[in-house]
């Protein structure tokens, strides 16, 4: 915790931190559209089989010259159970007799129809083009749409696992810059992917980069911030993610073509990559990894930016070494992921934090995936989701500062669980109430993410924070992958998935009681700091 002494000499919340936030917040805002891009880029428009009599571009398809388009559609495409044109089958031969029959009479058998062997015709009133229309991901191939989302999620999972290790090895700044460039290139190339498999590979790489950007954007700035302002920074960062969802709704509404949307979302990250050269590496990480000269330069640069004039005289290698000697000695022992579980206090903390992340991610993604059933158009729904999450995340800042870390998490997790469980008993006819409860659940789930993130940073020591962050984010990605799979349980009981979504956060809220309160406490740098923190809390109790 000695780094807090050095931070107080260079300024824990000044011009440098503000400039850092000016870079980080916009990059987080524009990152979310990349993660949720398939909500629009892979939208499935209305479609039907291509029919010679209707869709022959030569103009000779309608040989009668007197039949309307509706009449030609009637004799060419069978009706489904809702008396709407089938999306995946057509008549082998025109059924002229249907022109003289009541619309509710079906005089043809399954043998009279065939799949869409000549392709499909898509409704372009909402989206002129999506990856679904480009590669015909409908009917028997509709499941391929979920392959893209699965691979993106898998990329984020792999990024969560690897990101912490490479960041501890090569530094937060270098890995962040690499991933900013990788995301810009891969998602720009995805807009021009020649085949569906190539598109999938590029989206996997985009997911890999996205997760590391989220992690490495948050860690350095929180390490440069004084303890009593860390909650504010985390809330601002998570609030930027919510604003990103609102931005996505607006971008998708303006740029309906999926390729244009990809390019528009990707170009800003080339700019972020160029601007990131002025980012300063975490001095805490530099010192802990025995790069004292570089750490001293970083501290002096921060002091100059913050207007601390006597920093050159007061800050030198001897001061840094003597202040951080205990942490330097502890850091000489190479840390691994196993170190998170060797110490009883660390083992308890990491296991609880991982479960909390997992328990909140399942209802968050479970609710988000099924928001389409609310009935609103997807553009408005995306904006509404982001707006509600942003408002409740701002509320989380007040609860974190006034009620503490533990009580905030308990409050929000209980509200998530109770709102989801209550919604299972609300009739579908009561749409307003269902939407209100769904928004409450999503908003509180977003606030829980912010609360857990603040508590996580204050519970895990610097030497292990990036690796622990990788494990934490891995648990989040696993929860996200499981959330939609739980919907298959509806074959046993229609409300069973929702009951599971509601129970997990309630259990998580109860487990939070096992963690210590860390409000206004300095960040631990080593495992020994964690032990000392534990002793101090016991003495106060």
Swiss-Prot record:
GO MF term list: transmembrane transporter activity
Pfam family, one: Sugar_tr
Segments on the Cytoplasmic side according to the record's topology features: 1-15, 167-193, 252-259, 371-377, 428-436, 494-495
Membrane-traversing stretches: 16-36, 146-166, 194-214, 231-251, 260-280, 350-370, 378-398, 407-427, 437-457, 473-493, 496-516
GO cellular component, one term: membrane
Membrane association type: Multi-pass membrane protein
GO biological process: organic anion transport
Intracellular or extracellular location(s): Membrane
Residue ranges, Extracellular side: 37-145, 215-230, 281-349, 399-406, 458-472, 517-541
Annotated keywords: Glycoprotein, Membrane, Transmembrane, Transmembrane helix, Transport
Principal location listed in the UniProt entry: membrane
InterPro entries (UniProt xref): MFS_dom, MFS_sugar_transport-like, MFS_trans_sf
Record: glycosylation sites: 56, 102
Tissue expression notes: Detected in fetal and adult liver, and in adult kidney.
Entry's family note: Belongs to the major facilitator (TC 2.A.1) superfamily. Organic cation transporter (TC 2.A.1.19) family.
Descriptive protein name: Solute carrier family 22 member 10
Species of the source: Homo sapiens (Human)
């Amino acid at each position: 915790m000695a780094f807090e002494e050095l931070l107080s000499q260079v300024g824990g919340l000044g011009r440098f931190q503000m400039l850092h936030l000016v870079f980080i917040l916009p990059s987080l805002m524009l990152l979310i559209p990349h993660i949720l891009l398939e909500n629009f880029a892979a939208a499935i428009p209305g479609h039907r089989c291509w029919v010679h009599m209707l869709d022959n571009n030569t103009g000779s398809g309608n040989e009668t010259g007197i039949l309307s388009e509706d009449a030609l559609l009637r004799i060419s495409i069978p009706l489904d159970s809702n008396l709407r044109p089938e999306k995946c089958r057509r008549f082998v031969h025109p059924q002229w007799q249907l022109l003289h029959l009541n619309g509710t009479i079906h005089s043809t058998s399954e043998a009279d129809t065939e799949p869409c062997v000549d392709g499909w015709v898509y409704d372009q009133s909402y989206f002129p083009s999506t990856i679904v229309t480009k590669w015909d991901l409908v009917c028997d191939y509709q499941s391929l749409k979920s392959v893209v989302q699965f691979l993106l999620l898998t990329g984020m999972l792999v990024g969560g696992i690897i990101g912490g290790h490479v960041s501890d090895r090569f530094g937060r700044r270098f890995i962040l810059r690499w991933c900013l460039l990788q995301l810009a290139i891969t998602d720009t190339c995805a807009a021009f992917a020649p085949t569906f498999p190539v598109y999938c590979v590029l989206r996997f790489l985009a997911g890999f980069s996205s997760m590391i950007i989220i992690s490495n954007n948050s860690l350095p700035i929180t390490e440069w911030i004084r303890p009593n302002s860390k909650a504010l920074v985390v809330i601002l960062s998570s609030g930027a993610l919510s604003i990103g969802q609102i931005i996505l709704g607006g971008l998708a509404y303006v740029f309906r073509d999926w390729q244009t949307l990809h390019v528009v979302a990707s170009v800003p990250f080339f700019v972020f990559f160029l601007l990131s050269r002025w980012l300063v590496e975490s001095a805490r990480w530099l010192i802990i990894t025995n790069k004292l000269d570089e750490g001293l330069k970083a501290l002096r640069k921060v002091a100059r930016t913050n207007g601390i004039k006597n920093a050159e005289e007061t800050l030198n290698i001897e001061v840094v070494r003597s202040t951080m000697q205990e942490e330097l000695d502890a850091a000489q022992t190479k840390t691994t992921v196993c170190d998170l579980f060797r110490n009883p206090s660390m083992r308890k903390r990491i296991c609880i934090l991982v479960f909390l992340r997992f328990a909140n991610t399942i209802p968050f993604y479970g609710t988000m995936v099924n928001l389409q059933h609310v009935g609103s158009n997807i553009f408005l729904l995306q904006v509404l989701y982001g707006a509600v999450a942003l408002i409740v995340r701002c509320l989380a800042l007040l609860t974190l500062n006034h009620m503490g870390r533990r009580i905030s998490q308990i409050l929000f997790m209980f509200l998530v669980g109770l709102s989801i469980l209550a919604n299972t008993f609300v009739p579908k006819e009561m749409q307003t109430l269902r939407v209100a409860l769904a928004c409450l659940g999503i908003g509180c789930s977003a606030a829980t993410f912010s609360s857990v993130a603040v508590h996580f940073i204050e519970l895990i020591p610097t030497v292990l924070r990036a690796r622990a962050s990788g494990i934490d984010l891995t648990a989040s990605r696993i929860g996200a992958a499981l959330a939609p799979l739980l919907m298959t349980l509806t074959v046993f009981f229609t409300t069973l998935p929702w009951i599971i979504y509601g129970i997990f956060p309630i259990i998580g809220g109860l487990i939070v009681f096992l963690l210590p309160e860390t409000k206004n406490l300095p960040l631990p740098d080593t495992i020994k700091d964690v032990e000392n923190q534990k002793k101090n809390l016991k003495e106060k109790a």
